[in-house]
């Protein structure tokens, strides 16, 4: 298990780590199918091919995967794998009642992604004594 990182460190890692390490982390914590779903590919076996450097994901998939890494890493560090999965695949009021994983998969440009990591960061900071801020 990796040591928890600050949000700034997670952001730096997401930008600097080789894409294969990003994908391997997501596969370890979310599973191969969920990683494939987020990236926008239909065949989960592509994830293993990417890690093995047999292929590279397309640029838009790499952007999705790097954003997913940031959100996942923050949530796994704060709560563990199961809560991270539940957050990514559950409806999220801060994101217009859409699942973050769906938003990642559907993203076509940077603007489509910019609200996901801040929402994950806010949720990861929440504790039983300080729940996430709810919007009215």
Give short role names for the model-derived ranges.
Residues 1-136:
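Non-transmembrane "mature" sequence context
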């Amino acid at each position: 298990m990796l040591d928890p990182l600050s949000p700034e460190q997670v952001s730096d890692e997401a930008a600097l780590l080789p894409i294969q390490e990003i994908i391997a982390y997501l596969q370890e914590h979310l599973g191969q199918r969920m990683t494939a779903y987020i990236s926008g590919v239909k065949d989960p076996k592509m994830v293993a091919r990417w890690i093995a450097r047999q292929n590279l994901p397309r640029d838009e998939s790499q952007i999705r995967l790097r954003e997913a890494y940031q959100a996942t890493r923050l949530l796994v560090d704060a709560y563990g794998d199961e809560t991270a999965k539940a957050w990514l695949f559950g409806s999220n009021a801060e994101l217009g009642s859409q699942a973050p994983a769906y938003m990642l998969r559907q993203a076509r440009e940077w603007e489509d992604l910019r609200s996901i990591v801040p929402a994950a960061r806010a949720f990861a900071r929440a504790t039983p004594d300080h729940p996430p801020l709810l919007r009215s």
